[in-house]
Curated annotation (Swiss-Prot):
GO biological process, one term: viral translational frameshifting
Listed EC numbers: 2.1.1.-
Taxonomy, superkingdom: Viruses
Organism: Porcine respiratory coronavirus (strain 86/137004 / isolate British)
InterPro entries found in the cross-reference section: NIV_2_O_MTASE, NSP16_CoV-like, SAM-dependent_MTases_sf
Lineage: Viruses, Riboviria, Orthornavirae, Pisuviricota, Pisoniviricetes
Presence of keyword Glycoprotein: no
Annotated protein name in UniProt: Replicase polyprotein 1ab
GO molecular function, one term: mRNA (nucleoside-2'-O-)-methyltransferase activity
Length: 131
């Protein structure tokens, strides 16, 4: 995402992950680049309130303009504020029909990661927001 290249629905989609963050790679006086990183997509099992994507982008712009960033080369998953801790997490292949309350609870606690479930969405070139 940047100030001018973003998608409302991408912001809304990222909130359906149990853990998510923005990894900001470049900030100067006129521009920034951020990558939305999500771990453990819950989709319809997400019980969090979803904030409108336009508001999320406004919050990103406010944060970007009010935060002095130091240069760093840390991995996004190593940052202390990112609450997902994947130590000793089991990684499994599961189909949607195999999900139950216990599995979802393990996902939420970072004790289980699910892989190889195929492509979720393809936005194509729709990342550009045009007025």
């Amino acid at each position: 995402i940047t100030e001018f290249s973003w998608n409302k629905y991408l912001y809304e989609l990222i909130q359906r992950f149990e853990y998510w963050t923005v990894f900001c790679t470049s900030v100067n006086t006129s521009s920034s680049e951020g990558f939305l990183i999500g771990v453990n997509y819950l989709g319809p099992y997400c019980d969090k309130a979803i904030v409108d994507g336009n508001i999320m982008h406004a919050n990103y712009i406010f944060w970007r303009n009010s935060t002095i960033m130091a240069l760093s080369h840390n991995s996004v998953l190593d940052t202390p504020k990112f609450k997902c801790r994947c130590n000793n997490a089991l990684i499994v292949n599961l189909k949607e029909k195999e999900l139950n309350e216990m599995v979802i609870g393990l996902l939420r606690k970072g004790k289980l990661l699910i892989r190889n479930n195929g492509k979720l969405l393809n936005f194509g070139n729709h990342f550009i927001n045009t007025p």
